[in-house]
């Protein structure tokens, strides 16, 4: 039995740290120890990341990053970021704790999720800025022309410019409203809504909002279809999907909304148009923020590039599934599966 003297804390701390290393075997976090520049221990997670035969390797071969190795071999330890340890270019943080003169305890933390979130945030800000800057530049250009007395121009030209300014201002307003809507939805995405909502009623009321001559049909295999949900958000989903069918489908319609209650406790809601359809390579990305299959057509139709992203977030908040099916020349069907309310 080993006796530790608490009058000399260094050996005690070292022994406790070494004993703790054995507990790391069952952790999901990759961890290893280095003695005299060689890997002396690696838990299962570290072996899965760096290789099954990592024990006994020179740390310079195991880690393959000069900056990280320098931290590992330093007298003070510390942290270093490393990429390329795993397939797919994941980013890792190496945390080095000095156990003794020649021994180190190393923990590795996957930063991929943090990096991905940061990159998505940066992309989102850049895209939002671009989408706002484009109409804003047009507004400034036309306003400056109108204010320039030397430019002249008759009343018809002035009216044309003012209509363009109004159109671009409406584009910015729509974008800001969608950005705020998306922000509100994400803020409460973990709150499961519990109000009783009849989707048949909501579908018929929403279809009645469109008065531009587009034929919107609502067909249901039941008189009512109640789910637990947020009525306003569900109406927003249907409004967005119907509006897409109206804008990108065949001129004048029809846009067909079907509601089918299944025996397995789900409600299938599908919105189908008879437009030109969408190429298959675009389908997986349609719910990404600001992604457009046809940029010029979308902007001409007044789209913000956020509508389907909003739809996806709302459906997921309601514990449902959202899907888009389309073929060029065969129209597009956007569908969602929502759990029916249990009585």
Give a label for each model feature.
Residues 167-172:
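Short alpha-helical segment of the dimerization/phosphotransfer core of two-component systems
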Residues 187-192, 222, 226-229:
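Conserved micro-motifs of the catalytic ATP-binding
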Residues 58-113:
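PAS-family sensory/regulatory modules and their coupling/dimerization elements
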Residues 9-45:
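Sensory modules in modular signal-transduction proteins
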Residues 278-290:
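Short conserved segment of the HATPase_c
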Residues 319-320:
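Conserved glycine-rich
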Residues 245-246:
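Short helix-loop "hinge" at the ATP-lid/N-box region of the Bergerat-fold HATPase_c
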């Amino acid at each position: 039995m080993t006796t530790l003297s608490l009058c000399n804390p260094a050996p005690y701390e070292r022994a406790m740290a070494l004993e703790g290393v054995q507990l790391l075997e069952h952790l999901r976090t990759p961890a290893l120890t280095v003695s005299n520049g060689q890997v002396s221990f690696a838990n299962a997670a570290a072996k899965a990341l760096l290789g099954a035969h990592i024990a006994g390797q020179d740390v310079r071969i195991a880690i393959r990053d000069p900056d990280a190795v320098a931290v590992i071999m330093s007298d003070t330890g510390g942290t270093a970021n490393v990429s390329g340890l795993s397939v797919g270019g994941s980013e890792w943080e190496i945390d080095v704790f000095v156990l003794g003169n020649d021994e180190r305890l190393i923990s590795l933390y996957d930063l991929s999720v943090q990096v991905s979130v940061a990159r998505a945030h940066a992309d989102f800000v850049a895209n939002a800025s671009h989408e706002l800057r484009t109409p804003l530049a047009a507004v400034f250009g036309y306003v400056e022309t109108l204010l320039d007395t030397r430019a002249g121009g008759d009343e018809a030209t002035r009216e044309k410019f003012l209509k363009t300014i109004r159109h671009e201002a409406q584009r910015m307003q729509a974008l800001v409203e969608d950005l705020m809507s998306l922000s509100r939805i994400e803020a409460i995405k973990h709150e499961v809504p519990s109000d009783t909502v009849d989707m048949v009623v909501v579908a018929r009321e929403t279809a009645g909002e469109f008065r531009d001559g587009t034929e919107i049909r609502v067909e249901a295999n039941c008189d009512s279809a109640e789910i637990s949900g947020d009525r306003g958000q569900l109406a927003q989903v249907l409004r967005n999907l119907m509006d897409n069918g109206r804008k990108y489908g065949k001129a004048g319609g029809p846009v067909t909304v079907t509601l089918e209650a299944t025996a397995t406790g789900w409600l299938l809601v599908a919105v189908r148009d008879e437009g030109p359809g969408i190429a298959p390579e675009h389908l997986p990305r349609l719910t990404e923020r600001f992604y457009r299959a046809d940029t010029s057509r979308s902007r001409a139709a007044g789209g913000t590039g956020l509508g389907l992203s909003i739809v996806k977030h709302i459906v997921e908040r309601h514990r449902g599934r959202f899907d888009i099916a389309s073929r060029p020349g065969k129209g597009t069907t956007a569908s969602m599966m929502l759990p029916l309310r249990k009585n």
